[in-house]
């Protein structure tokens, strides 16, 4: 009797594809194997990762196929589920990661898919809202606003037309959880949006995806078509962004969906009251909405609320990136420390050099030194430390990093990405670049814009000292933090001032 072909599971996640997964899959198919393309386990340093009967091999190349099949490969990592990186996690949002085919409805249903929506539709909208509120779920996009309160506001708002909008404009450096979820488990996001629609009375949903995610866009469109009868009468459409970082801000995003320039709106009114096309709108990010199906499953809200610490409830998919040995996605309850994340789980730097800084929360997050790695990963602790959790991105830098240059980059990034509507962000970021350059050069460069301004007759004639420039930088940071219309200008001071505080030696003498 002819033996059945070996079934090989290989991710079709964008990162795996970039690492050569298609070539590895083709080599296994040529060797007579049945190849299944599944979602990513999130162990990015091992991609392309090959799974055969639960055993993992990686990073694999086409040349490794023969050794893997005959059992002599040196790239075996044992059972994937038992690997310390996976076994130590508390996966709820990413419970299906590595285990299912992304656009297989059969796989989704076999892993409790649609259970949350089925239960939600057997409940009243008020009961669903109470369940989400009781779970303690907060927005995973950075603001950390309680999801239940936002939904309740939309539900209570007058009007017959309401919308659910998913912010999938994942523009922060070092973040990839949204992309992984959309590419690996799109039905879960769709289910979460359908539950939100039932709770607030919305009939239409939009997923706003950045144009740099073509694989995610294709997976979402395929999944939406397959899920149409499951979520009806609710409808979902994908809208593609044009690359503006500021469109990750909810009101800029709404303008973009409406076909307008991606520009921040003044608040009030809040989008929950006057959002898309002037109608009450729920705007949540991918991870927030993807957490909903579990919460609405039987007993899910109570269990979800039991995880985490104080007001930071549930789990957070943390993304380990930058100069780190074991980069990838690690989902765990709030409260874990940076030391655990970077050193125990991440394995330290990929370069082998000492860790100098970690930036948490994307390009607008504060730089945290090793002396503060004891901080628990939760919203309140980071707020007290003048830092941000943001979208859960953790980017590692070794001791070769120039923190003065990183501070300058924060201002330059803000200047390049500003929508231009408010003065503190538009002008402050440009002045910030000039000021950092002046401080780092010891005031020896050409006169900056401030010095070039017309001077009052009674202005002091002495040039600005380093102390003057540092005070001016602090004043500028305060103005941007409290005067900007959105977080782009408002959060730029976090990386700048944290770099100056902890590494003054990188700013010159």
Which positions does each model-derived feature cover?
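Hydrophobic alpha-helical positions that pack around
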Residues: 111, 213, 217-334, 346
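Accessory "access/gating" subregions that flank catalytic or transport cores
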Residues: 118-158, 305, 311, 319, ...
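Histidine-anchored nucleotide/phosphate-binding helix
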Residues: 185-199
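Ferredoxin-type iron-sulfur electron-transfer modules in oxidoreductases and energy-metabolism complexes
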Residues: 2-7, 21-37, 46, 53-71, ...
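Short amphipathic, charge-patterned alpha-helical segments
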Residues: 192-194, 333-350
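Short acidic, glycine/serine/threonine-rich loops at helix termini
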Residues: 19-23, 46-51, 143-151, 175-178, ...
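Gly-rich Lys/Arg/Thr-decorated short loops/hinges at beta-loop-alpha junctions or inter-strand turns
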Residues: 105-115, 166-178, 271-276, 319-324
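Flexible inter-domain linker/hinge segments
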Residues: 74-134, 277, 281-299, 307
